[in-house]
Amino acid sequence: MYNFQIDMKIEVISGSRRENANTEIMMKHVVEYVKQKDVEVKFINLSEGGFEYYRGWVSNYNEKTLQAAKDITEADVWLIGTPIYNSMYSAALNNLIEFVNYKETEGKTAGLAIIASGMIGFTDVQTLVTQLMSYFRVITNPVPVFVTADKMADGKIIDEDVKSRLNQMVDKTLELAKRN
């Protein structure tokens, strides 16, 4: 177990717009685990709705959208969960990231949790999200968590190994951020 500074800000993002989706379940576990640390944590859950579509650098977006972009920009660490859709990460996640100014994110750290119905596409999506993080000059934990949907049931993670791997991803990502 690592000791982290209270002034470290963590943003957990559930990148699926589907309510009660496996991505949301997975990232709620991450939020609960992070809350045990001595850090500030916020949760952006795209399934809650109310996030606008990016239309360029205009100022008339709703408060929820602008606050999410501000929270992401101010966070030291991004813990991102995304489903795989046709070997691609979530378009809703991509839309949210469009609101973030890459000039204000250098040196941040990200951890990834990726969920799919089967075993195909994980490294494709890992590569795409890592490249996106690179554009934002965000250092990405090289060990993501890959989860298949059969590890979820009745709104819960049913595989203890998945919980353990998510916890390890959080710890390693926070340790990487601490060293950065």
Please provide the spans of the model-predicted regions.
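N-terminal beta1-alpha1-beta2 submodule of the flavodoxin-like/Rossmannoid cofactor-binding fold
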Residues: 1-102, 156-180
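Short, histidine-centered active-site or binding-site loop motifs used for metal coordination
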Residues: 14-16, 114-116, 149-151
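A glycine-biased structural micro-motif
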Residues: 106-107
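Short, glycine-/small-residue-rich phosphate/pyrophosphate-handling segment
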Residues: 110-147
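Short alpha-helical linear motifs
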Residues: 133, 151, 168-169
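Short helix/strand-capping connector loops at secondary-structure junctions
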Residues: 145-157
